[in-house]
Amino acid sequence: LLWKTFHFWEQLCTPEYYTDKEGQPHYKKGKTFLEDGERYLIIPSYSPENHPIGYTSTITANAAMDIAAASDVLRMIRELEERIGDERSTERLTACRELAKKLPEYQADETGGLKEWSLPQMRDNHEHRHISHLYCAWPGVETQHDVRLAESCRQAIRNRNTGNVGKDDTASHGWIHKGLVAARLKDSEGLGEILRLLVYSDIFYSSLLTDHNTDRCRGVYCTDTILGLQGII
């Protein structure tokens, strides 16, 4: 299954769509290999339900979530093949390392926060509940070995919390997702704020089942919070 997923990313990435040394996107029909400093452009790409400022479509390019998902698959294959250690493993390890070197790099905005789309033309829209671009922290594990990336993710959460006040910030799954990421980042202060917000909100019914929203504005049962809290702890 992992190797089939490798082929998905290998086939999605084509030298015809690439970024140059400055990170600018290009399309060149018939291009068959990447030059030094060039990287694949992941297109089409998707960051759930959100789009960059000035865009109307959620279909974009170089979504950080896709970069992280591809990186995570390559990591799992490497760990598995290193344990197997046969002749086929050597070939697969080489293929994984080659693809990993050509994947897009994460980018940070002017605040140092991880960008949701790794292209200079795409500005993050913080008026949104999702933080799917922090896949590299959770469920991925890249931030466990990269201090700079971890801090960039912490700043990204702060940016989203500030930019989404009074917008769609009552969606419980958004806060649970932030809590899972904060816990993985060992951000005790940020996690404490999230837990207090949830526990002292109006999200719990008398049965202790939880609503979809912290203010119960829609009256919809949702297990995201009641189960997510346990996952965070």
Predicted regions and their residues:
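The feature captures the catalytic groove of carbohydrate-active enzymes
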Residues: 1, 10-94
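Short amphipathic alpha-helical surface micro-motifs
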Residues: 5, 21-25, 117-122
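Active-site core of glycosidic bond-cleaving carbohydrate-active enzymes
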Residues: 63-231
